[in-house]
Amino acid sequence: MPLSDFHVSEPFTLGIELEMQVVNPPGYDLSQDSSMLIDAVKNEITAGEVKHDITESMLELATDVCRDINQAAGQFSAMQKVVLQAAADHHLEICGGGTHPFQKWQRQEVCDNERYQRTLENFGYPIQQATVFGQHVHVGCASGDDAIYLLHGLSRFVPHFIALSAASPYMQGTDTRFASSRPNIFSAFPDNGPMPWVSNWQQFEALFRCLSYTTMIDSIKDLHWDIRPSPHFGTVEVRVMDTPLTLSHAVNMAGLIQATAHWLLTERPFKHQEKDYLLYKFNRFQACRYGLEGVITDPYTGDRRPLTEDTLRLLEKIAPSAHKIAASSAIEALHRQVVSGLNEAQLMRDFVADGGSLIGLVKKHCEIWAGD
């Protein structure tokens, strides 16, 4: 399928997607019932969309195009209420978190969807292993060239986005020792990590043509890059965050990305170069492994900086932009999180260290999501 033209969007408009876990009490393993829930709510959702993701244990909540995080929060709140009621009616529960702590990937059923079934045929078992749960944030752009500039700018802060949202320390019943283990699942895919270097939209079109020759790439949706342009929507989509445990934290993460995008496109603080990506995977690893306790390295100077320190610096830089787009509350909340040193991955480990079971952990996550 040829690449569509870049659809012109109103700059800095927002779209958010949350991949939620559908679980089956009292054992709190993943259920295979997302299709049933989607059918139950389809006539009750007035804004946004509730839809499938790769496997039947995943439920995606997606906003419409929103002008700011307050509008997005309102849409999510309404969807959350409808979905929670439908889940209760079917004796199911819903929670966040980047991974389910003890599910077995072999049990996961790929949705009866042509694209997902084709992807399963192409990639095999990694598709079932990709039963992990992330938050994606779209930011509107006025042109394809703006989208490429924004993508490169946001890529500098991928470690910060991962560290702030880290919520997947457990996988397959084991403490992975990672704050965010979810991104590791995608390492088997040939397009894992950053987008190959291009400097403008024309070069991106040539890149996509080259990728399509493999016959494995039919559309942008078949690419698993950390950040990707979405020409059909006229956006740049950031895909590196774990799904948070609370709706409020998800909204704050979206506000962070929207404010960072506003700062990048209005100030143009960087002249992007291919060398910017030289240590990308090393810095990304630090964030996944250690969260905000990680250390990032400048590819030009070799200077090493604590992620905590660099994240506080980013929040300070984007504060004026956040004020202009009504996202100051998000930046202030994230600032408090960084200063406190708390993150969701550590809270999960603390629960288990205090004697909680992994079953109890999922139960607690369901209570947190329903109570937010």
Curated annotation (Swiss-Prot):
<keyword id="KW-0547">Nucleotide-binding</keyword>
<dbReference type="InterPro" id="IPR011793">
    <property type="entry name" value="YbdK"/>
</dbReference>
<comment type="subunit">
    <text>Homodimer.</text>
</comment>
<dbReference type="Pfam" id="PF04107">
    <property type="entry name" value="GCS2"/>
</dbReference>
<keyword id="KW-0067">ATP-binding</keyword>
<dbReference type="InterPro" id="IPR006336">
    <property type="entry name" value="GCS2"/>
</dbReference>
<comment type="similarity">
    <text>Belongs to the glutamate--cysteine ligase type 2 family. YbdK subfamily.</text>
</comment>
<dbReference type="InterPro" id="IPR050141">
    <property type="entry name" value="GCL_type2/YbdK_subfam"/>
</dbReference>
<protein>
    <recommendedName>
        <fullName>Putative glutamate--cysteine ligase 2</fullName>
        <ecNumber>6.3.2.2</ecNumber>
    </recommendedName>
</protein>
<dbReference type="GO" id="GO:0005524">
    <property type="term" value="F:ATP binding"/>
</dbReference>
<keyword id="KW-0436">Ligase</keyword>
<dbReference type="InterPro" id="IPR014746">
    <property type="entry name" value="Gln_synth/guanido_kin_cat_dom"/>
</dbReference>
<dbReference type="GO" id="GO:0042398">
    <property type="term" value="P:modified amino acid biosynthetic process"/>
</dbReference>
<comment type="function">
    <text>ATP-dependent carboxylate-amine ligase which exhibits weak glutamate--cysteine ligase activity.</text>
</comment>
<dbReference type="GO" id="GO:0004357">
    <property type="term" value="F:glutamate-cysteine ligase activity"/>
</dbReference>
